[in-house]
Amino acid sequence: MSSDLVMPALGRPFTLGMLYDTRREKLIPGFSLFGDETLQQYQSSNTQRSSEFKIVASDSTESKSSAMDIEASLGVSFLGGLVEVGGSAKYLNNTKKYQNQSRVTLKYKATTIYKQFTAPPGTVKVQETVITQRGLATHVVTGILYGANAFFVFDSDKVEDTNLQDIQGKMEAVIKKIPTISIEGSASVQLTDEEKSLASNLSCKFHGDFLLESLPTTFEDAVTTYQTLPTLLGEDGASAVPMKVWLVPLKKFFSKAKLLTQEITVSKVRRIHTTLEELYKLKRRANEAMDDKLVQQIPLIHDKISNFHQIFQDYMLTVQKKIAEKLPLVRAGTESEQSLQKIIDDRAKSPFSNENVSTWLEVIEREIAVLKSCAGMVEGTQAKFVSNQTELDREVLAEDVKHALCFVFTSVERNDPYLKVLSDYLESPDSKDGKEAVPSTEDKWCFSTRVVLKMKQRAQTFCDHVNDFEKSRNVGFFVTALENGKFQGASIYHYKDGSLATQDFTFPRMPFVQGYKKRSDLLWYACDLTFDRNTINIWVSLSDNDTFAASEHGKRQNYPKHPERFLCYNQVLCNEGLTGKHYWEVEWNGYVDVGVAYISISRKEDNWVSAIGHNTCSWVFSSIPRAGYVERYNQRQYYVTVPTPGFKQLGVFLNWPDGSLSFYAVSSDEVHHLHTFKTKFTEPVYPAFCLGYRFDHGTVRLL
């Protein structure tokens, strides 16, 4: 082949008279075929000033090549790694990281001057060197068009697949406005509110032949930079760079030169394009999976995807290296195009085939989707994600954790035979081992409707437990992934006092409140309380971080005025308004009323209306020295017989949804039911206390 060639410079430092090897797409710097005098004598220049902008809406290699004016032959050389690009051409290497990500590129192109070598072949003497004698070059540069390119690459955040096209269209509409925005006006002023919102969430990456003081990273930056580009080429285009070059076969000037024997056919170029485009697409899917927020919290699956990503990256480099090795040989006529076809065919028959890798990623993506469906149910609760068994052990062994419930993804596997097959194939492509590990969606737990449904049911059960014990100080809640073949999908582990009690937890059915005998059964619901300083009466003192209260006859406390303060009775509420199921214990002595009240209870009335137990918004159990124990509501009171008079520890269990408030005498790990109020609570209730009456003193400690 002896035709002239025209190609984009792609940021490479071309000069007139420079030699070029089209077989290897290699510049040969440091030598000119013509001497300086000859170049000066036959060089001509023509002004060719122009500028244009273009929107590139696709991130495909084909679209990028078109934007850079790259023909098929040079394109396959770039894909094969033969061409090292620079300047604006680095845009070719900028690919989307994620599949579900919208990308729109704004291209600005300006040309300044065209220089050419005008001497006809055979009329000038050429300089011979070892380069020309050994046939290391095929062409010589005889024309260069100067100018500059700039590419503003705008990316959205990851979006849902269903919104991708909509976001893409809106991005194109906004970015098309950039060249029309006046330099005096702010970009935001000339956009609609919806467009402003969209533009503010776009990131920008700049690739250009212009020397900028700072690179644009936002839409606003891009608008400002775009307006300044025409001024950055300098006077008479002094800062312009080679954009397009014209090459003439070296044989026209030097008869002993080698020729480019054959070029790669367009159909073969397309197949190579397709193959590499498939690889990049699969890589983006892996990126998307690996960077998922949930995946990063689960080392079992993250490490597996990361391992695949590294293996696949190595394979891509291997394919590119093979293409780079074969292209010069095919162009020189040493090998046929079949050697390139073999690379494509070998991949199709290998574990790295598009079908195999796509199926494996499909399983991974489905697995992630199922995990997220369950994790999404737990999100927003107080459950904590832990990454592995060691971290889980550290949490369940914490001093304040009596019980721990852990929602465990049990079917996330650490080892994947397919990854071993891929790794082995990279080491030994001719090996036939591993055929049985071809990926498949059959018999995968994440594709089983039964398994997924059961996982969601368990996740809902777990969430119910979290909500039931939301304020419990004794129960910790965790989520993790631990491989366990006994359970498909997920299970709930129960740890008690730091030890695993069961891997398939079912909360014991609640007995009637009178049926509780063991204190440990109620401690599931134990909550932390503190006295509210804004409600406490001035004749009651507080200490021990607001957990101990005592009546102080004749000792007025210096509390500031507050509208919530009880003025007439030695009463105090706790800070915590409670709904749900809660249990707390107090250590009491003397005259003490213990119960709950609505926040609306009167604070100022100098009569029984503001006394707890003497109205319709409070319920109490009382210890009255020399008289015994009573339960009191709305001024009605009844004496209660207790098994051990003088007991010092009282337990209170609130089942707000069920409308019950129960009191227990506590001794070691046993409780004895004393009384239960039944009602319908209509608002949160606050633990309430009255300490001392007349000459009787009273103290309460929150345990």
Curated annotation (Swiss-Prot):
Residues 508-703 form the B30.2/SPRY domain. It comes from the Eukaryota. GO terms for biological process: killing of cells of another organism. GO terms for cellular component: extracellular region. Heterodimer of alpha and beta subunits. Keywords: Acetylation, Cytolysis, Disulfide bond, Hemolysis, Secreted, Toxin. Not glycosylated. Expressed by the venom gland. One of its GO terms (molecular function) is toxin activity. InterPro entries: B30.2/SPRY, B30.2/SPRY_sf, Butyrophylin_SPRY, ConA-like_dom_sf, Cytolytic_pore-forming_toxin, PRY, SPRY_dom, Stonustoxin-like_helical. This is Neoverrucotoxin subunit alpha. The keyword Zinc does not apply. Belongs to the SNTX/VTX toxin family. It holds the Pfam family SPRY. The modification N-acetylserine is found at residue 2. Has hemolytic and lethal activities. Its hemolytic activity is inhibited by anionic lipids, especially potently by cardiolipin. It is found in: Secreted.
